[in-house]
Amino acid sequence: MKRVGILGLPRSGKTTVLEILMQGAGSGAPGGAARDHVGVVRVPDERVDRLSALYQPKKTTYAQIQFVDSAAAGHTSARAAAKGPDLFSGVRTNDALLLVVRDFENPAVPIEGGVDPARDLRNLQAELILNDLAIVETRIERIGKELRVGKKQGEREHAVLARLRGLLEAERPLREEAFDAEEQKLLRGFQVLSLKPLLVVYNQDERSTRVPPEPGAQALALVLRAHLEREIVALPPEERPAFRAELGLAEDGLSLLIRACYRLLGLISFFTVGPDEVRAWTLRQGENAVDAAGEIHTDLAHGFIRAEVVACDRLLEAGSEAKARERAWLRLEGRDYQVQDGDCLEIRFNK
């Protein structure tokens, strides 16, 4: 399951964003750090609904993404200085980061210096970069000691870290830089924050007219009216579409956020179907049939023979697997087949 960490300065509305993501469709639990909250969010997908209506299975399972509302950001002063990289230890395990930036006026919730989304985004990015710099400098110091006593195996790592330090000191997020395979492997071990895929959510209200600043290269941005979305979620489900239409909102906030996270992480959904269960699975775009088999169960990947594949839309159009097979819409694919978004798979394997 992919994890997305939610960060934001105080009074930015990041907890409201998590409430929108939850909206009764997932489950929540306290995290490990003070005031962290974890939400397992069901990914809405009308294809799952339609497949479930077709198969009438005993169980229907949607894809899931875990969101972590972190208490780490916004402590650049005494707490950050005392804690250093440990303050962000839980954040580093996430696959991507979602930064909530305040872009609304509310006298009841004042903010020092006034509302300035460009400033707040710079401050949040600076926290991530400073945290990465602390990690890199600690490692450079350790390797330097080893090199001084004649241990040469750390020379390559030391050179890479020196490059990283230069980039970070220049306040350049690592996600905007190019790294070779060896460097990428090294970076994965450090779980540096400024390398992670980044989604910036500008939290506006219905009166906001400001065009939000660009988040930089290798990052996505979207505008969300979090307070309004929370009010809509509080309505009975049957009343929500009409209310959204009246306000001119084409898409609900949950779908908007999930779709952005899928794009950010390069994810697709594939399905397994049958009378016992209809289930959605996530996979990275470009991964193959063996990767998909491994998502279902490692035994399927180890014993993989072939994958029987049919596009979800074709299966629904046919009305059954038998009719899809009659129309030659089911096909067998080998281990190198790149799974497409919406594929229904049945894995054939050696037991």
Predicted regions and their residues:
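Conserved Switch II/interswitch segment of TRAFAC-class P-loop GTPases
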Residues: 41-44, 71-81, 92-154, 167-179, ...
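C-terminal-of-GTPase-core extension/linker across diverse P-loop GTPases
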Residues: 2-22, 36, 142-351
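Conserved G1/Walker A P-loop phosphate-binding module
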Residues: 1-107, 112, 118
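Amphipathic alpha-helical transducer elements in NTP-driven molecular machines
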Residues: 15, 41-48, 64, 81-84, ...
